[in-house]
UniProtKB/Swiss-Prot annotation:
It catalyses: (S)-4-amino-5-oxopentanoate = 5-aminolevulinate. InterPro entries: 4pyrrol_synth_GluAld_NH2Trfase, Aminotrans_3, Aminotrans_3_PPA_site, PyrdxlP-dep_Trfase, PyrdxlP-dep_Trfase_major, PyrdxlP-dep_Trfase_small. This is Glutamate-1-semialdehyde 2,1-aminomutase. Pathway: Porphyrin-containing compound metabolism; protoporphyrin-IX biosynthesis; 5-aminolevulinate from L-glutamyl-tRNA(Glu): step 2/2. The keyword Isomerase applies. It comes from Azoarcus sp. (strain BH72). The modification N6-(pyridoxal phosphate)lysine is found at residue 266. The gene is hemL. It comes from the Bacteria. Pfam families: Aminotran_3.
Amino acid sequence: MTSRNEALFSRAQRSIPGGVNSPVRAFRSVGGTPRFIERAEGARVWDADGKAYIDYVGSWGPAIAGHSHPAIVEAVREAALRGLSFGAPTESEVEMAELLCALLPSIEMLRLVSSGTEATMSAIRLARGFTGRDDIIKFEGCYHGHADSLLVKAGSGLLTFGNPSSGGVPADFAHHTVVLDYNDLDQVETVFKARGDQIAAVIVEPVAGNMNLIKPRPGFLEGLRRLCTEYGAVLIFDEVMTGFRVGPQGVQGLYGITPDLTTLGKVIGGGMPVGAFGGRRDIMNCIAPLGPVYQAGTLSGSPVAVAAGLASLRLTQAPGFYDALAARARSLVDGLSGVAREAGVPFSADSIGGMFGIYFSPSVPASFAEVMASDREAFNRFFHAMLDAGHYFAPSAFEAGFVSAAHGEADIQATVAAARACLR
């Protein structure tokens, strides 16, 4: 008998390329039929067949308070009643900018956009306009959205589909993108010594989350800061995923590094489409209408998205919020690691704040090459066994996972118990 998930996927493929609107959702990496989600609440989602899952995807990061949090839903309802979009400034977007500037000391001015891709694309253009240089440095396996110049040896969906770069990206774009190994500061230093006067920016996920979770080695981020300062390049932290997810000031707060520009998304939209980029005042003053670097958007600063984002951020400001979130993630990775040891399965796991990574390898990877060496077939088997048991992990070995404030210890222990059965 055909399930509703299967029927919907078949139907979707007739009108949507691959049946999905973002490639990783297609389950191509793990095989099988994607789950079509009909509703979500707290730490759970329900698919088209009515099956419930404890959710560790969390809309790929935004659902930090859990799904359908009453405060966020009410904020969206109230904003929608006042009007969905105006194409004009609003007080709420000023409030959002002021809040983000207050929460992240590196941000002196900020511009709201409609997605993380828009944020990183605009930050790169701004860095080029500010410096008068063309070249950028990025790192293999780090994903910064689907802008052309950033789709060279990127992570996330490109890794899932086994492609180092996207088709349709002109060679000239790739020519201005220098791709180096994440966590290899010597490579960065060599490039700066050879062509430092041509480098406009270094863009990095300060904690990588799109080749699974990879933390920076000691001194790596500090070295990037030093080199960018020395050569006059703009240091861009892509905190679309990590911003307000790993701590109250993102990775930059945890590691004490001040970037020149920061890109944000996900949590700051509370589940609605939103992005932002901001940083030093002298750089941000180059953006139109103040300066020559153009950026615009019909729905930038959407009043409904901003309302959701403000509600989401206010929830994270509760005392002990991030300590509790980190404890939940640590409980999960410790539990999964323990049952894998019991089963004799090569496995490792790590977490930071409300993010976690699981790897079918004997040690936690520190580089793209080490991630690629993990046992992806073992991950695929684990994914499907856990899915069948009602636990929804990211459908790719190259994606980080997320816990929310709605995950209770009982949820975590239920997942660990299911993993014990699946790994036998």
